[in-house]
Amino acid sequence: MNAPEILNGATAAAPAGTGEATPVHARARSPLTRREQKEAYENNKLFKRLARQVGEAIVDFNMIEDGDKVMVCLSGGKDSYAMLEILMRLRERAPINFDIVAVNLDQKQPGFPEHVLPEYLKQLDIPFHIENQDTYSIVKRLVPEGKTTCSLCSRLRRGILYRVAGELGATKIALGHHRDDILQTLLLNMFYGGKLKGMPPKLQSDDGKNIVIRPLAYVKETDLEKYAELREFPIIPCNLCGSQPNLKRAEMKALVRDWEKRFPGRIENMFNALANVVPSHLMDHKLFPFAGLRATGEADPQGDIAFDEEPCSTDSGNSTTLDGAKSIAIVQFDDL
């Protein structure tokens, strides 16, 4: 039995003497082995976690509203496949009504298997549109050899998708960026752009005509990798992006993966920090009126605590408190 069958609960084979497969609901299910039971349990937990996180993001940022027509951008990668499937499953039990239309932009890259996505989407029995635009040739012509193509390719793709959304009557454009993409963008902007800027879960397009949403904003990439493997999605690699050497985003991805492995909890804290911003403790005078600050003589609970002692976990494992709990070291800022 393969992984998709375990995830869906379909376990029986076709009856003897027939050459045709029997519909899942009509088959007599054979007992699961202990290993298959464990796999099914873990796979079900994974889907529930993904569905919960997507649902939370949709609610937290009011991504999808009653009557929306959501244009799900499908690239052929693991993230967009998972996003489409989860949104379809959530729609079945959502308290609101919304439509889904899947859209793929065929950029005419050499070797792109044009048949894969149409065949897959027909099996799902949902509306879809394949937009054929040769942006590949434009990018290769305009970008010098050895330079990264991502910026120009992204701008061309964005403009086309905005136009298609208008033609299809879509009210929301769903992109498959996940938690790790958001953190990588934050680090890229900090390290190479000098900006404290990430990737928003919801935004208005630069032309003011579209709302872009990222339903996978709370989802870890490793979970999406596991889910794609279980579902056996027909993954289509991007020969234009993935084959480019020395991409800064690849460096950030490796950095995030390394931190997550070596320092459990660090990445979660970084991600949580994006939703816990304190403008008065940054340095952007456009966000906080530093110039107008005056001593009022009244206590301010939101005031400066830069000279207070800050708890920093040592994680050394060498010292414990009387009750056996790990101690917290108090570190003064002037000692750092």
UniProtKB/Swiss-Prot annotation:
Catalysis performed (reactions): cytidine(32) in tRNA + S-sulfanyl-L-cysteinyl-[cysteine desulfurase] + AH2 + ATP = 2-thiocytidine(32) in tRNA + L-cysteinyl-[cysteine desulfurase] + A + AMP + diphosphate + H(+)
Q: Which SUPFAM superfamilies does the record cross-reference, listed alphabetically?
A: Adenine nucleotide alpha hydrolases-like
Q: Name one GO biological process term.
A: tRNA thio-modification
> What cofactor requirement does the entry state?
Mg(2+); [4Fe-4S] cluster
Q: Where is this region: Disordered?
A: 11-31
Its annotated compartments are: Cytoplasm
At the top of the EC hierarchy, this enzyme's class is transferase
- Per the Swiss-Prot or TrEMBL annotation, the motif PP-loop motif is positioned at 75-80
Q: Where's it mainly located?
A: cytoplasm
Q: What does this protein do?
A: Catalyzes the ATP-dependent 2-thiolation of cytidine in position 32 of tRNA, to form 2-thiocytidine (s(2)C32). The sulfur atoms are provided by the cysteine/cysteine desulfurase (IscS) system.
Which PANTHER family did the record assign?
AMINOTRAN_5 DOMAIN-CONTAINING PROTEIN, SULFURTRANSFERASE-RELATED
Q: What is this protein called?
A: tRNA-cytidine(32) 2-sulfurtransferase
Q: What organism is recorded for this protein? A: Paraburkholderia xenovorans (strain LB400)
